[in-house]
C-alpha cells in the first residue's frame, strides 16, 4: 500500500469509528466540519438509516457540499444554535486535546460550531498527533482578522507576543492577493514555535485581545475525544 493510500485508509478508519461510537441515537442537530478526514465522517453519517431525522450544520462551503452530497438535511447555525454533537478534523492535536485548526481557512465557523456542541469529536490520522502544538504543524497558528487591521496585528504579534514570523496568507495560483475567508476576512499564520501545553489557553487569550482579531485557530478546552487512524490499521482514541 502506498503512503497516500495508507493515510487515506487511516482517515476513513478514524472517522467511521468516531461516528459509530459517538453518534447519539436521538440526535436532532449535528455539526459537520471541514477537511479531508471529515469527508469520511460525513460519508458514514450519510449511511445511517435515520438520516432524515436530524439536521446537519456546516462549518463552511466545503462541509455544506459534503452535507448535500451525502443526502443529509442542511441547516444553519442561526436556525439551530444548539448542537448535539460535532465532528471535525484538526491540523494538530496535543495530549490535552488542544488543537490547531484553520489550515483550510474556516476556523471561525469551525469554532462557532464546536462551541455550540454538547460534544465535540475530532477525527484525524496519525500524522496529526504531537506532544506539543507547533511540533509537526510548522505553518503557524491561523488567525482570522478584519482586513484593514493586518499591518498593526502583524506588528503586535511579533513585538508584543514574540511570534517568530507572521504571514498574511495568500491565495497562491488560485487567487491573486490574500485568501478571503467565508466571513470576508483575512488570515494570518503566526509562528510561535512549539507551544507548551499549559500556555495554549493563555496565548489564545493574548491574541484575541488584539484589536481586529476575529478568532484564533487555537482550540482549547473544547474537544471531548480525538480519534486517530494509525499506520497499522488500528484506531487510537484520546479523551479528557
UniProtKB/Swiss-Prot annotation:
| Xref: SUPFAM superfamilies | D-ribose-5-phosphate isomerase (RpiA), lid domain (SSF75445), NagB/RpiA/CoA transferase-like (SSF100950)
Q: What broad class describes the main subcellular location of this protein?
A: cytoplasm
Q: Write down any Gene Ontology CC term.
A: cytoplasm
> Which InterPro entries does this one have?
NagB/RpiA_transferase-like, Ribose5P_isomerase_type_A
Task: Name the Gene Ontology biological process terms.
Answer: D-ribose metabolic process; pentose-phosphate shunt, non-oxidative branch; pyridoxine biosynthetic process
Please state the pathway this protein functions in, per its UniProt record: Carbohydrate degradation; pentose phosphate pathway; D-ribose 5-phosphate from D-ribulose 5-phosphate (non-oxidative stage): step 1/1
Query: Residue numbers for the site described as Plays a direct or indirect catalytic role?
Result: 88
Q: Which keywords fit this entry according to its UniProt record?
A: Cytoplasm, Isomerase
What CDD domains does the database record attribute to this sequence? RPI_A (cd01398)
Q: A Pfam family for this UniProt protein?
A: Rib_5-P_isom_A
**Per UniProt, where does substrate bind?**
34-37, 88-91, 101-104, 128
In alphabetical order, the GO MF annotations are:
ribose-5-phosphate isomerase activity
Spell out the reaction equation it catalyses: aldehydo-D-ribose 5-phosphate = D-ribulose 5-phosphate
Q: Where's the active site on this chain?
A: 110 (proton acceptor)
Enzyme group, top EC level?
Answer: isomerase
Enzyme Commission no: 5.3.1.6
Question: Where is the protein localized?
Answer: Cytoplasm
State the family it belongs to: Belongs to the ribose 5-phosphate isomerase family.
Per the entry, what this protein does is: Involved in the first step of the non-oxidative branch of the pentose phosphate pathway. It catalyzes the reversible conversion of ribose-5-phosphate to ribulose 5-phosphate.
Q: Cite the PANTHER family for this sequence.
A: RIBOSE-5-PHOSPHATE ISOMERASE
Protein name (Swiss-Prot/TrEMBL): Ribose-5-phosphate isomerase
The scientific name of the source species is Candida albicans (strain SC5314 / ATCC MYA-2876) (Yeast)
Starting at the broadest rank, the lineage of the source organism is:
Eukaryota, Fungi, Dikarya, Ascomycota, Saccharomycotina
Amino acid at each position: 500500500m502506498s503512503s497516500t493510500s495508507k493515510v487515506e485508509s487511516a482517515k476513513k478508519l478514524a472517522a467511521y469509528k468516531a461516528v459509530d461510537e459517538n453518534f447519539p441515537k436521538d440526535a436532532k442537530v449535528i455539526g459537520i466540519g471541514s477537511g479531508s478526514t471529515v469527508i469520511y465522517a460525513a460519508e458514514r453519517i450519510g449511511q445511517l438509516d435515520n438520516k432524515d431525522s436530524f439536521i446537519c450544520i456546516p462549518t463552511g462551503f466545503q462541509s455544506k457540499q459534503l452535507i448535500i452530497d451525502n443526502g443529509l438535511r442542511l441547516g444553519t447555525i442561526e436556525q439551530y444554535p444548539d448542537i448535539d454533537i460535532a465532528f471535525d478534523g484538526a491540523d494538530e492535536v496535543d495530549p490535552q486535546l488542544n488543537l490547531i485548526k484553520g489550515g483550510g481557512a474556516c476556523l471561525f465557523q469551525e469554532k462557532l460550531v464546536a462551541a455550540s456542541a454538547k460534544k465535540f469529536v475530532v477525527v484525524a490520522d496519525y500524522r496529526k498527533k504531537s506532544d506539543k502544538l507547533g511540533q509537526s504543524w510548522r505553518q503557524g497558528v491561523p488567525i482570522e482578522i478584519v482586513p484593514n487591521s493586518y499591518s498593526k496585528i502583524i506588528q503586535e504579534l511579533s513585538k508584543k507576543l514574540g511570534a517568530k514570523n507572521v504571514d498574511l496568507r495568500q491565495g497562491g495560483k488560485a487567487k491573486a492577493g490574500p485568501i478571503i475567508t467565508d466571513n470576508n476576512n483575512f488570515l494570518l499564520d503566526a509562528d510561535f514555535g512549539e507551544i507548551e501545553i499549559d500556555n495554549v489557553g493563555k496565548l489564545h487569550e493574548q491574541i484575541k485581545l488584539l484589536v481586529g482579531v476575529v478568532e484564533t485557530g487555537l482550540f482549547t478546552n473544547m474537544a471531548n475525544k480525538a480519534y486517530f487512524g494509525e499506520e497499522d490499521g488500528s484506531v487510537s482514541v484520546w479523551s479528557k
